UniProtKB/Swiss-Prot annotation:
It catalyses: phosphate(out) + ATP + H2O = ADP + 2 phosphate(in) + H(+). It is a peripheral membrane protein. The complex is composed of two ATP-binding proteins (PstB), two transmembrane proteins (PstC and PstA) and a solute-binding protein (PstS). Its EC number is 7.3.2.1. Keywords: ATP-binding, Cell inner membrane, Cell membrane, Membrane, Nucleotide-binding, Phosphate transport, Translocase, Transport. InterPro entries: AAA+_ATPase (IPR003593), ABC_transporter-like_ATP-bd (IPR003439), ABC_transporter-like_CS (IPR017871), P-loop_NTPase (IPR027417), PstB-like (IPR005670). This is Phosphate import ATP-binding protein PstB.
Length: 265
């Protein structure tokens, strides 16, 4: 897949998976995200780009309430998953995170076997009635993480013994094991070498057949390669959102053009 593949592809009209309406995020008195409105489409890769500190990772963490773990963080506005408010008091954040999975910047396999890393979520959420069903989920997830062939003969070896790229693909397999609807990725390739990065990017393109994928990246080349939609954040504002090809070749806002051409960053 080259830089222009995702940019040049025609995006079919997709239904909205996540809708954010008037979202603001505060860390104490600091206003980190300012009145963001955006719709994330189903079975589409959406990239969040922008300079360091622009708010893209903060907003990403709003989408599965990871910011709940920060005492001084306050979120206002509405974020709807399939039309349901994820910040409703009746929503269980643990269950939400099974629906909206997360892959972090640094690979973080649990100090468990490869098998138990992937089986952890299905066990917690009661997704398997017996060992045979759990085995099936683990294999299916490792295949979706594009790592099954590399680990199928050592499933009981520690996940931490894998290479960095393998660990990140294991974390992706772990995230999809609970059958999420959305997969969030916060700089998933920043700690990986170019070969491992290419493998993860190829995997992201495959994952969108089954999931909505939202990726935060500092690499504009990566955003161009893997995404169909791109959102540009600057100083806590969502400056521009649209088809990736348009954002990179014909942006409407001068701030977007300045970032794309390297004049701000």
């Amino acid at each position: 897949m080259n830089d222009m593949t995702a940019m040049d592809s025609t995006v079919e009209t997709q239904r909205t998976k996540i809708a954010a309406k008037g979202v603001n995020v505060y860390y104490g008195d600091s206003h980190a995200i300012k009145d963001v409105n955006v719709e994330i489409e189903d079975k589409t890769v959406t990239a969040f780009i922008g300079p360091s500190g622009c708010g893209k990772s903060t907003f990403l963490r709003c989408l599965n309430r990871m910011n709940d773990t920060i005492d001084i963080c306050r979120v206002t506005g509405d974020i709807l998953l399939e039309g349901e408010d994820i910040y409703d008091k009746r929503v269980d954040p643990v269950q939400l995170r099974a629906q909206v999975g997360m892959v972090f910047q640094k690979p973080n396999p649990f100090p468990k076997s490869i098998y138990d890393n992937v089986a952890y979520g299905p066990r917690i959420h009661g997704l398997a009635k017996n060992k045979a069903e759990l085995d099936e989920i683990v294999e299916k997830s490792l295949r979706r993480g594009a790592i099954w062939d590399e680990v199928k003969d050592r499933l009981h070896a520690p996940g931490t013994g894998l290479s960095g790229g393998q660990q990140q693909r294991l974390c992706i397999a772990r995230a999809v094991a609970t059958e999420p609807e959305v997969l969030l990725m916060d700089e998933p390739c920043s700690a990986l070498d170019p070969i491992a990065t290419a493998q993860v990017e190829e995997l992201i393109d495959e994952l969108r057949e089954n999931y909505s994928v939202v990726i935060v990246t500092h690499s504009m080349q990566q955003a161009a390669r893997v995404s169909q939609k791109t959102a540009f954040f600057h100083l806590g504002n969502l400056v521009e959102f649209g088809p990736t090809g348009q954002i990179f070749t014909n942006p409407e806002d001068p701030r977007t053009e300045s970032y794309i051409t390297g004049r701000i960053g």
